[in-house]
Structures are given as C-alpha cells and as structure tokens.
C-alpha cells in the first residue's frame, strides 16, 4: 500500500516501509496501526497514528493486505534428527496452537541444505509473512549467513550459535544432561557411559557438556569413577545397529548409560535386551526428551522431560512481541528448563562395605 502526503502529487508518496523507518518501528507495526488491526500495544498504535497525522500521511486508494501468516521454517541439513517425529510433533503442536490463539495463521516451509539456499532465502524475504520461526535443530554456524539479513522479524528455535545472536528459544540441555548424570552418580554407579549421537548438533554438544560437568564434579567425591563414550547413529535403525556392533566386542559394559535422546535410548534398550542384559539389573538407562514411547517401554524409562509444547509457545510469543513493538535494541535467549522423570530403568547400587 502507498501512503501520500496530503496535497502532494502521487509521485511524492511514501511507502509503509519508509514510514516505519521514520518512526523506528517495523513495517508490520505501521500496517497494523494504520489499518486498525489488533496485534500491537496501544502505546505503539498511538505513536504511529500521531506521527502519521503530523506528517500528513493518509491512505491511498489502494489497500494493503496485512499479513496474517507466521512462517515456520524447518531447516533440513540431513533430516536424521527430524526423524524423531514424536518430539517435533509436540513442538509444532505448541506453535500451531499459539499462532491460532493469537489470531494468526501458520505456514510451514522447508529449506534444504542441498538446494539453492540463496534463492530460497530471496523467496522468503519477499513473501508476505509477518515473521519467521526458524527451526534450526540441524543448522550449524556456517548456515547462519543466509538468514542474517532476512529483513523480517525472526526467532530461532531449538539451537543457538556462537557467530549469530538473534532472538532464540532453546532447551537447557546442559542442565538436563547434568541432572541425568547426577542421578546415576547418586545411585552409586562408578562406571558410566554416554551414548552419544554420531550426528553433531548443538543440542547434543550441550548435553555432552552437561554430562562431563557432572562427571568432573564427581571426581572430587570419588576418585575411582570412570566414564566412556559410545557413538551411535541418531535414527532408530542406525542406533540399534551401532549398539549391536559395540556389544559384540565389549568386555566391560558400564553399569549405567546416559543417552542423547529417547530415540537412541529405546533402540539401544532393545539391543541390550537381545544381548541378554537386564535393565536395570545389569545396566541402568536414562534418556532425554520424554517422548510418549519412553513410558510404554518395558521397563518404563527414566528420562529428562522437555516441555516440548512450551518451546513452540514461547517462540511464537517472542516473535509476536517483536512484530508488535518493532523496535529492538537487543536480542534475548530463552532457555526452557527440564525435569528428571524417575521411572524404572535406574538401579540403586549397593554401597561398598568397610574394608
């Protein structure tokens, strides 16, 4: 839509983007205010309308359509992590519910690392969406360059980056992994394994850091504690196959295993049983995510609960706040804390008697 100064020719008209730049707010906020739509604070609306009156700006004959769409952009580098459909379905449920509650509609699109990213970003930048939630689970730092100058309100979900600091909503992975490992330490386990994904993403790196933090701190409590790392694939089939190969050659299995996520944990539990190991009598297991399958395993699996719908909800709420206010002199990182769900896969070890 064009906005023109009263009494001036149409070729002197200014766009809504120019008006937004003049006021230091987003074009979406200007459009919302000038069209009497909900979605911005009353203070921002009053500021925009007052400035528009002062500058003699009025609506042209043409009417601009305000975008009612939020774009959920899923970045796929390899797709191996997104195979965990129970986790991501719950996150997307939180997004879609909140988008609807706030009066918007949801668009879902995919960016593929093996396609022309420049063209994909160009198409997104000229689209009519009000803002973007970037599901960045599989992204690495080198991928961020495509989104730095997007020109739309943006919230990154489920990852964070050293080289780029937009608004971000993530799991507190370090806290969750630390709590899971402390659970095993406090249960008396002296030889603990970290079953980690061979696919590197920031979530798994942080879980590794939380695991090592707990192990390192415990060294001061007991010097005889040991740990090992077991690398497996991130899908059900590859985790199962890799654990099978590991068990075929292992001579001294840890008494407890912390798994990077529940998909890996469930597959590895199945393979452990097929190799004759009893859970938790022979080996204890703690997963991460608390997907529905984790409480129908036999025995029911102890795991780290992630409030998955809350991840999506907070991402939408943060994005809508940016759309409404426009001004942004800082970015924020929201970490969603986890809780440990104690079920039936952790054995309390007997304390050694006096020598």
Please place each PLM-identified region on the residue numbering.
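N-terminal helix-turn-helix DNA-binding module of bacterial transcription factors
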Residues: 1-66, 353
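Alpha-helical recognition/docking segments in bacterial nutrient-uptake
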Residues: 2-7, 11, 68-182, 246-252, ...
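Non-catalytic positions within long, well-ordered alpha-helices that form the structural scaffold/packing
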Residues: 21, 125, 185-188
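Hinge/beta->alpha junction and helix N-cap segments in small-molecule ligand-binding domains
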Residues: 77-90, 108-115, 169-179, 195-244, ...
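Short helix-capping segments at alpha-helix termini
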Residues: 101-102, 216-224, 249-252, 274-279
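Periplasmic-binding protein-like
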Residues: 129-135, 193-196, 229, 250-261, ...
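Flexible loop/turn connectors
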Residues: 244-355
């Amino acid at each position: 839509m064009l906005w023109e100064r009263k009494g001036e020719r149409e070729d002197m008209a200014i766009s809504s983007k120019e008006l937004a730049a003049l006021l230091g707010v987003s074009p979406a906020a200007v459009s919302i205010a000038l069209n009497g739509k909900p979605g911005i604070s009353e203070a921002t609306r009053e500021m925009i309308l007052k400035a528009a009156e002062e500058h003699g700006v009025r609506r042209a004959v043409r009417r601009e359509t305000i975008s009612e769409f939020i774009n959920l952009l899923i970045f796929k580098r390899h797709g191996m992590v997104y195979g965990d459909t129970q986790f991501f379905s719950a996150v997307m449920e939180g997004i879609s519910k909140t988008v609807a509650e706030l009066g918007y509609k949801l668009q879902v699109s995919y960016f593929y690392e093996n396609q022309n990213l420049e063209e994909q970003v160009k198409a997104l930048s000229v689209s009519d969406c009000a803002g973007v939630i970037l599901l960045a689970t599989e992204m690495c730092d080198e991928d961020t360059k495509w989104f730095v100058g997007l020109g739309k309100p943006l919230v990154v979900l489920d990852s964070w980056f050293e080289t780029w600091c937009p608004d971000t909503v993530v799991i507190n992975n370090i806290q969750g992994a630390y709590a899971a490992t402390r659970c095993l330490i406090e249960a008396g386990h002296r030889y603990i394994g970290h079953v980690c994904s061979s696919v590197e993403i920031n979530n798994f790196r942080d879980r590794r850091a939380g695991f090592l933090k707990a192990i390192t701190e415990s060294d001061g409590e007991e010097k005889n504690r040991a740990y090992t790392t077991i690398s497996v694939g991130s899908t059900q089939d590859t985790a199962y196959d890799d654990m099978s190969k590991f068990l075929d050659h292992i001579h001294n299995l840890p008494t407890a295993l912390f798994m990077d996520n529940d998909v890996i944990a469930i597959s590895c539990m199945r393979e452990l049983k097929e190799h004759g190991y009893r859970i938790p009598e022979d080996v204890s297991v703690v997963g991460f995510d608390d997907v529905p399958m984790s409480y129908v395993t036999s025995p029911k699996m102890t795991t780290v609960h992630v409030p998955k719908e809350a991840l999506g909800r907070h991402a939408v709420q943060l994005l809508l706040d940016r759309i409404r206010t426009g001004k942004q002199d800082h970015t924020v990182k929201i970490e969603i804390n986890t809780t440990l769900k104690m079920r039936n896969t952790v054995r309390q070890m007997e304390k050694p008697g006096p020598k």
